[in-house]
Swiss-Prot record:
Pfam families, per database record: LMWPc
Catalytic residue list: C14, R20, D130
Taxonomic superkingdom: Eukaryota
Gene name of this polypeptide: primo-2
Function according to Swiss-Prot or TrEMBL: Catalyzes the dephosphorylation of tyrosine phosphorylated proteins and low-MW aryl phosphates. Can contribute to the regulation of a variety of developmental processes.
Keywords: Cytoplasm, Hydrolase, Protein phosphatase
Protein's name according to its UniProt entry: Low molecular weight phosphotyrosine protein phosphatase 2
Cellular compartments annotated: Cytoplasm
Tissue spec: Cone cells and primary pigment cells in developing pupal retina.
Family indicated by similarity: Belongs to the low molecular weight phosphotyrosine protein phosphatase family.
EC number: 3.1.3.48, 3.1.3.2
GO MF entries: acid phosphatase activity; non-membrane spanning protein tyrosine phosphatase activity; protein tyrosine phosphatase activity
Source organism: Drosophila melanogaster (Fruit fly)
Reactions accelerated catalytically: O-phospho-L-tyrosyl-[protein] + H2O = L-tyrosyl-[protein] + phosphate; a phosphate monoester + H2O = an alcohol + phosphate
GO CC term, one of those recorded: cytoplasm
Amino acid sequence: MGKRSQKSSVLMVCVGNLCRSPIAEAVMRDLVARAGLQGEWHVESAGIEDWHSGHQPDERALNVLARHNIEYNGKARVLAPEDFLEFDYIFAMDLSNLAALRRMAPKGTTAKLLILGNFGLKPDERIIEDPYYDIGEASFEEIYRQCSIACRNFLKQARLKQIM
């Protein structure tokens, strides 16, 4: 990962690693692959809570990714203390996630803790809302849209070394 290799590393985080962070991970991996940058980037996702470890993402998330021709085979995992040292960037989907990340970060954390939506989304769209209890896939499609914009902008800024 980031600190063990020359690759830059990104960890996408939401509450349970079932809906938002797997979509963000899949979108980021797809963008990296399309740009031919697989040798430069390592991307994963995790959940703050250990409610769903080992499970596949929500079926609605997988359906939306499939509609956009993006494969995803990951399984949910919980955020680990070492993630804060091994990843360069850890992205929260909302302010609650960010607050939890800040509380959980061990002393000496080297990762940048950021809100994914701050990269290219309008101020009123920057929070990527949890769709877990929503009916249907419309909110998952919106998450895909938000993640696509934010990941594209982050990758562009990171490659230009514009991330502080």
